[in-house]
């Protein structure tokens, strides 16, 4: 066993990516439901293509919703205000196909305000944390997200006058991977590759795009000591990217689950988040798993941590729990699992109560990731990012 170098990559997308647009529409609908009825049962999907956005799914709520207004305001907020950008919030078609939740599912879950509330579906959910950044998120992810956020910020402010809403970023980091003494310790060394594909107007030159992305985005986000003469840059490598948003590619809720989580690190159970109320453990238990993993790393109990939870539909208690610290734990993983069980209640009701999830806090999560963030909009969200002091 030794120390050797590895390369690992993570990607991110801006709010104008067609799949992300759909995530935001679904969570905007969810927030509207929860604002009017905290006990709403929501499973809202969205899809988008040229000149069209459709919301569909199952919703049971006392809230009165204006779907047309919610969808159009979301599209406007993203920045799609003309057809040549990929979508026009004023003229696009908004289609709605919403039904009530299946009575079979509803009766199987029990009272939404009961401690015995059953999980909304089966599945396994993962949470991950690492000490390589202040947010306890992977560096590859934080850098890719940082590039996407900076691009969006400059686009919105007009500092990138040619920029349009749809963009993707990707960062490859070289790590020292130390496997001595049975551990798996990762130490970031340098940024090996930076990739940005940014939608632009038809007048700007490729050279102008490259200079702006390098000077205003990359150098503003990635520390200079992480870049070197060997770092490779791919800036709009396809050449031109005028047609973007839903005009360029169809969008669908739930297709950016790695962007939503840890950039490929840890693991993923497959369930998406957006458009789902907190009785759906795809969302609430994934938030709880991150809360546990972050609490372990923040508390100095491990340098890296992966947590898995598993549930059955209609059953309140998790079927299984697993903690993996990659040999970096203060205690062995079995001991850490016992500490977790002593400090966290993980029935859906308990997760919802502890993290205060029956509130309209989800729209902000639907762009730029669900983890490693603070409450930037003042909605009281991201409670799962506040580590819990655990009794050992």
From Swiss-Prot:
Enzyme class: transferase
Enzyme Commission number: 2.5.1.6
UniProt remark on cofactor binding: Binds 2 magnesium ions per subunit. The magnesium ions interact primarily with the substrate. Binds 1 potassium ion per subunit. The potassium ion interacts primarily with the substrate.
Annotated K(+) binding sites: 45
Pathway this chain belongs to: Amino-acid biosynthesis; S-adenosyl-L-methionine biosynthesis; S-adenosyl-L-methionine from L-methionine: step 1/1
PROSITE patterns: ADOMET_SYNTHASE_1 (PS00376), ADOMET_SYNTHASE_2 (PS00377)
Protein name stated in the entry: S-adenosylmethionine synthase
Organism, as annotated: Leishmania infantum
């Amino acid at each position: 066993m030794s120390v050797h170098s590895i390369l690992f990559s993570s990607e991110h997308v801006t709010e104008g990516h067609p799949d992300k647009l759909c995530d935001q529409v679904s969570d905007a609908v969810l927030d509207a439901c929860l604002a009017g009825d905290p006990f709403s049962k929501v499973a809202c999907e969205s899809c988008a293509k040229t000149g069209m956005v459709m919301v569909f799914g199952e919703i049971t709520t006392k809230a009165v919703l204006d779907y047309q207004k919610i969808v159009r305001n979301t599209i406007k907020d993203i920045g799609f205000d003309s057809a040549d950008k990929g979508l026009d919030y004023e003229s696009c078609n908004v289609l709605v196909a919403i039904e009530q939740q299946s009575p079979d599912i509803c009766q199987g879950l029990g009272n939404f305000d009961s401690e015995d509330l059953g999980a909304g579906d089966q599945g396994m959910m993962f949470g991950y944390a690492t000490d390589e950044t202040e947010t306890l998120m992977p560096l590859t992810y934080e850098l890719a997200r940082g590039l996407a956020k900076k691009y969006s910020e400059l686009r919105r402010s007009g500092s990138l006058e040619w920029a349009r809403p749809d963009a993707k970023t990707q960062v490859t980091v070289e790590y020292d991977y130390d496997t001595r003494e049975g551990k798996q310790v990762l130490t970031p060394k340098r940024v090996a590759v930076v990739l940005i594909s940014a939608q632009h107007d038809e007048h700007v030159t490729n050279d102008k795009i490259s200079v702006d992305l390098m000077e205003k985005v990359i150098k503003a986000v990635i520390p200079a000591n992480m870049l070197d003469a060997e770092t490779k840059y791919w800036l709009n490598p396809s050449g031109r990217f005028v047609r973007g948003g839903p005009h360029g590619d169809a969008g669908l809720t739930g297709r950016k689950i790695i962007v939503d989580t840890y950039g490929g690190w840890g693991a993923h159970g497959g369930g998406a988040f957006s458009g789902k109320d907190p009785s759906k453990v795809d969302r609430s238990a994934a938030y709880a798993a991150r809360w546990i993993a972050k609490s372990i790393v923040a508390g100095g109990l491990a340098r890296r941590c992966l947590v898995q939870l598993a549930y059955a539909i209609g059953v309140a208690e998790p079927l299984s729990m697993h903690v993996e610290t990659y040999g970096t734990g203060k205690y062995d993983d079995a001991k850490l699992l016992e500490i977790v069980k002593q400090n966290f209640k993980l029935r859906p009701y308990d997760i919802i109560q502890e993290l205060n999830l029956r509130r309209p806090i989800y729209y902000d999560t639907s762009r730029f990731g669900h983890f490693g963030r603070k409450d930037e909009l003042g909605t009281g969200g991201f409670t799962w990012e506040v580590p819990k002091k655990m009794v050992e």
